[in-house]
């Protein structure tokens, strides 16, 4: 599967972990792990929450289709 999000990269840049993000969102850490490895994708509402928590724009979390 082609990578769609940059969540793993942004977490590293912000010095945060998937476990931290899961706790903030009230999600299972395995769900966040799937997002980080691009096995699954968060819905748009969750993506907005993630962007807010990490203090980045949504565009920073998504890989451009160029």
Language-model segment annotations:
Residues 21-22, 50:
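Short alpha-helical "recognition helix" segments of helix-turn-helix
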Residues 15-16, 42-45:
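Residue-level signal for the short linker/turn that defines the boundary of a DNA-recognition helix
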Residues 26-42:
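Recognition helix of helix-turn-helix/homeodomain-like DNA-binding domains
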Residues 36, 54, 62-65:
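DNA major-groove recognition helix of helix-turn-helix
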Residues 1-17:
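A short, Lys/Arg-rich alpha-helix, primarily the initiator
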Residues 45-60:
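DNA major-groove recognition helix of helix-turn-helix/homeodomain DNA-binding modules
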Residues 13, 24, 53:
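Residues within the alpha-helical elements of helix-turn-helix
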């Amino acid at each position: 599967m082609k990578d769609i999000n940059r969540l793993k990269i942004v977490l590293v840049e912000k010095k945060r972990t998937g476990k931290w993000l899961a706790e903030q969102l009230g999600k299972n850490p395995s769900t966040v792990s799937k997002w980080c490895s691009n096995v699954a994708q968060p819905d748009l509402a969750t993506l907005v929450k993630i962007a807010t928590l990490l203090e980045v724009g949504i565009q920073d979390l998504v890989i451009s289709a160029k």
